[in-house]
């Protein structure tokens, strides 16, 4: 039986098995067995089963991080951020007010992707929607805090767009397992991929959405995403307070 969650890896593994069996048959030391290959989770080898979780991770990361950083930097460029900061409103509530619209937008995007995957691409959601939503909220929290951290470092919208857009798009696409299996990467790239939040999200979403597993199977990925979110939120708030001082 072959795990076909990733069609490319599934084909490769099936080919290896057939090659080993073929060598055993050529040796002539054993009777010819009947080889039956069973593809688990994705018997039709649809590529959509692989790229739908990847697209979810890519969109959530880019929209939250890029739009949040650009929005806050725009306020700094126009001078309205300073006006807001000298008001009686606490800075944390100002940041939350900027982040909430993109949180809602990301939830809408998540629902849209799931509807398209189920009704257009015919990729079922085998696991719990609550678990999938919880994992998505963790990634959104990571992306929002990363966008806030970027806005504290850069000085203008162009720089924010370059750092949050190009700086996140390529690592997410190449090092998260969205396109290339992580197991086939060089050891250095595998190590670097550990700090890519989308890697853990995509890995967990495949288990829940395609394999139908529950929270007990993705607690490791959820714990890593929670740690990343807490770390980035702490760094971004600290950096934001330093800029205020």
Please identify what each model-predicted range represents.
Residues 69, 73-74, 87, 117-125, ...:
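Short helix-capping/hinge motifs at transmembrane helix termini and TM-loop junctions
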Residues 91-165, 170-173, 215-222, 226, ...:
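Alpha-helical transmembrane segments and their short interhelical loops
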Residues 66-70, 114, 118, 148, ...:
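Transmembrane alpha-helix boundary and packing residues in multipass membrane permease domains
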Residues 42-45, 124, 173-231, 244:
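Membrane-interfacial helix-loop-helix junctions in multi-pass membrane proteins
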Residues 1-67, 71:
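Transport-system extracytoplasmic interface segments
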Residues 238-245:
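Short cytosolic juxtamembrane segments of multi-pass membrane proteins
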Residues 66-89, 99, 245:
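Transmembrane helix boundary and interhelical loop/hinge segments in multi-pass membrane proteins
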